[in-house]
Design a protein with these regions (language model features):
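Acidic/histidine-rich catalytic cores of soluble enzymes
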Residues: 63, 156-252, 256
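Charged helix-capping and loop-helix junction motifs
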Residues: 76-81, 108-113, 144-155, 211-219, ...
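A short, acidic, flexible beta-alpha connecting loop/helix-capping segment that sits on the rim
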Residues: 276-293
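Hydrophobic faces of well-ordered beta-strands that scaffold small-molecule active sites
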Residues: 13-20, 63-65, 93-97, 126-128, ...
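N-terminal pre-domain/capping segments
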Residues: 1-125, 156, 194, 260, ...
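Active-site groove signature of glycoside hydrolases
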Residues: 118-147, 167-180
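Acidic-and-aromatic substrate-binding clefts and catalytic sites of carbohydrate-active enzymes
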Residues: 65-78, 99-109, 136, 176-183, ...
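A short, acidic, amphipathic alpha-helical segment used as a generic capping/interface helix at domain edges
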Residues: 251-267
């Protein structure tokens, strides 16, 4: 990449965190069990109040939360209490929803429901996973007819809700969440062609769609209103090729170069970088896994602040 301009090099972002980072503690989403044909939910040992306390202690500025973190309680009283609690903690909130999550239906919502919930908690952004299904083999299925039919319906549904999006003034982000190729996310955003609607780039999800990480970030950066900032170790052994989540800076994703791309190419609507870690589920007890998540979170926050220059507060 060419040398960054001084303006880009000096660009600041708030430091946020996706609640999925602590999913073993019952936050975010209990993901990954769909292959077993059943749903499973980790016991919640950290509720949203404790999560906000932890965020302040660790120097986070934004929490990227799901309906699981709201305990699926969308009563006006509860959502107003969440909004006020975030204000009291000095935290911004972003809402993460899916249309048809395969293993944890608690995170699912319609566009209409998500907009109302996001507005009620004072969210600055609502991120959508579209759960578009592609035929196999997947590597060459980008923009295939089966996917395009689903995407066209999604575009039309968002268009119907643009008056509400404008009324509430929340940013909207469409994610490459194991279900959309980079070009498909961009197609949806360009079809909607609205200043409040952009993309959410997860820095490792492209691997599942047989895409390169650098190429994905390069393409999506100009559209990014949201980033799930991940690092993974990628390796092969006799059991196959693996991509395992780890603390930021410990993996095979060049996170320094990714931040250079985002600082140079992302629009001003991208004001937050959300840490996300997906540690492996195997190799330790559940209790030890929860401790590992906290350790990886703290190591990542330190790296993102000290090495990547992310964060606008002194703590």
């Amino acid at each position: 990449m060419k040398k960054m301009t001084k303006k880009a090099a000096d660009r600041k972002f708030k430091l946020g965190m996706h609640s999925y980072t602590l999913h073993l503690s019952g936050l975010g989403e209990s993901w990954g069990f769909q292959s077993e044909g059943k749903t499973y939910a980790f016991e919640k040992v950290i509720d949203l109040d404790k999560f906000m306390d932890l965020a302040v202690e660790e120097g986070l500025e934004v929490l990227h939360i799901t309906l699981v973190d709201l305990d699926k309680d969308t009563s006006p009283e509860h959502l107003e209490a969440v909004k006020e609690n975030a204000k009291k903690h000095g935290l911004d909130l972003e809402l993460n929803v899916s249309f048809n999550a395969p293993s944890d239906p608690r995170v699912n919502a319609t566009i209409e429901e998500a907009l109302e919930i996001g507005h009620s908690i004072g969210a600055t952004l609502v991120k959508f996973s579209t759960d578009v299904e592609h035929p196999h083999p997947i590597s060459h299925s980008c923009m295939c007819p089966e996917a395009m039919t689903q995407m066209a319906e999604i575009v039309n549904n968002f268009k119907k809700n643009i008056p509400t999006i404008e009324k509430y003034g929340m940013k909207i982000a469409i994610e490459n969440n194991y279900d959309l190729f980079t070009d498909e996310v961009i197609w949806i955003v360009e079809q909607l062609n609205h200043p409040l609607i952009g993309a959410c780039c997860d820095t490792i999800n492209s691997l599942v769609m047989s895409e390169g990480v650098k190429e994905c970030v390069d393409k999506m950066a100009p559209y990014c209103y949201c980033v799930h900032f991940c690092d993974n170790r990628v390796f092969a052994d006799p059991d196959g090729t693996h991509s395992l989540g780890c603390a930021i800076g410990d993996g095979d994703i060049d996170v320094v170069e990714i931040m250079k791309i985002l600082r140079e190419k992302a629009p001003e609507e991208l004001d937050t970088i959300d840490l996300e870690i997906e540690l492996p589920l195997s190799g330790y007890t559940l209790e030890d896994g929860r401790k590992e998540e906290i350790t990886a979170m703290r190591k990542s926050i330190k790296y993102m602040k000290e090495v990547l220059g992310i964060g606008t507060t002194e703590k």
